[in-house]
Regions:
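Extreme N-terminus of proteins, especially the signal/transit-peptide cleavage junction
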Residues: 16-24
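Flexible, gly/pro- and Lys/Arg-enriched active-site loops
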Residues: 22, 28-173
């Protein structure tokens, strides 16, 4: 296994979004320097500290994800309102809500002032123009992938916090 260092980056949108949903829509992801997220519907790495951070930040909140992301998990994530965005009108999921449009997904998250968008690549691209905050773990390295995080335009986003971490024994790649 390859050990690499990573850094946590928090970005805020520089100006108000065109479509204001009265929410702090937050994209949360771990992506490599080449924007890789996953391959074959699985995460490329396992970084224990980052998974704990994900759990801490998203617990008690609505989480919006694509169908493939939901199906990559053994079950709906506990202590969260799981919302699946899919084009499949007949899709059903145990312990989760199903939406077919961005507006429908946000409507299902109406009771949460800070819903989290948790993937995958297509879903991040759909919600990036609506997001207020990016909680991004940048895994340093280039990885082969088939799902990617969208590029962040520095004209629109401002880095407001960064925390660097060295490689540790609890990382699997």
């Amino acid at each position: 296994f390859k050990k690499v260092y990573f850094c946590l980056q928090i970005y805020s949108f520089k100006e108000m979004n065109e479509l204001e949903f009265q929410k702090d829509i937050t994209l949360i992801a771990a992506a490599s320097d080449n924007h890789a997220l996953g391959k074959d519907n699985q995460l490329i790495w396992h970084i224990s500290d980052d998974l704990k951070r994900f759990k801490r930040l998203t617990s008690g909140h609505a989480i919006i994800m694509g169908r493939k992301t939901f199906e990559s998990m053994p079950k709906a994530l506990p202590n969260r309102k799981n919302i699946i965005l899919t084009r499949n009108r007949s899709y059903q999921a145990l312990d989760a809500f199903v939406a077919h449009t961005i507006e429908e997904a946000l409507s299902l998250a109406a009771d949460d002032p800070q819903p989290f968008i948790i993937g995958g690549g297509e879903i991040y691209s759909l919600f990036l123009p609506l997001a207020d905050t990016l909680e991004l773990t940048r895994v340093h390295g280039h990885f082969e992938a088939d799902a990617f995080f969208p590029k962040i335009d520095p004209q629109n986003w401002k880095l407001v916090a960064e925390e660097k971490h060295a490689a540790s024994q609890d990382q699997d790649f």
